[in-house]
């Protein structure tokens, strides 16, 4: 992210050229699900993660928030491509600026197409509030508050009906 001012947002709103505008809306994916086998195939060691297509790397990358910041997890691209192929909204994510944000701490799990800066906001929350080996009560409360806010602000994408 180079700038977040309204002027740059207007200038780069069409996504042409080198810079892209980060969208403001998050979308709750009511019909998206990952079963345990799919999640395990992605090799994410915790139950929070975000996935986005990086134009610099020319592939989808996976990160999870940690006490040390955003931590990259080596992603099995075949597993990811199989998941993405079944979900049109995931295929439509804008490179570099939108991510699939997964919250498997919630019951049931929650899935959002989120502006990338919200993913890094969550990472900052984890980094700021983490204490000790297991994180401490403050971090889990802050994570829950983050997702409550995101859930309330997100546009709900209704399930597809055949």
Region spans (language model):
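N-terminal cysteine/histidine-rich coordination modules
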Residues: 1-28
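Generic recognition of cysteine residues
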Residues: 3-5, 59, 119
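Residues in well-ordered beta-strands of folded domains
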Residues: 4, 20, 51-53, 62-64, ...
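Ordered, amphipathic secondary-structure segments that act as subunit-interaction surfaces
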Residues: 26-68
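Selected N-terminal structured segments and early membrane-anchoring regions
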Residues: 45-52, 76-89
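Primary mode marks residue(s) on the alpha4-beta5-alpha5 output face of response regulator receiver
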Residues: 55, 65-82
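C-terminal, charged low-complexity interaction regions
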Residues: 81-162
């Amino acid at each position: 992210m180079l700038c977040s001012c309204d002027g740059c947002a207007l200038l780069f709103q069409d996504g042409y050229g080198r810079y892209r505008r980060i969208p403001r809306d998050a979308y709750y994916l009511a019909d998206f699900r990952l079963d345990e086998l799919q999640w395990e195939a992605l090799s994410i060691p915790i139950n929070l993660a975000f996935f986005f297509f990086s134009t610099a790397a020319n592939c989808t990358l996976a990160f999870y928030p940690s006490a040390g910041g955003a931590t990259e997890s080596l992603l099995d691209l075949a597993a990811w491509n199989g998941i993405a192929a079944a979900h049109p909204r995931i295929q439509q994510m804008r490179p570099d600026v939108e991510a699939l944000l997964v919250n498997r701490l919630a019951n049931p799990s929650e899935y959002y197409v989120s502006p990338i800066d919200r993913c890094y906001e969550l990472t900052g929350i984890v980094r700021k509030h983490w204490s000790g080996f297991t994180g401490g009560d403050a971090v889990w409360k802050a994570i829950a508050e983050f997702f409550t806010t995101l859930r309330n602000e997100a546009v709900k994408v209704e399930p597809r009906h055949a």
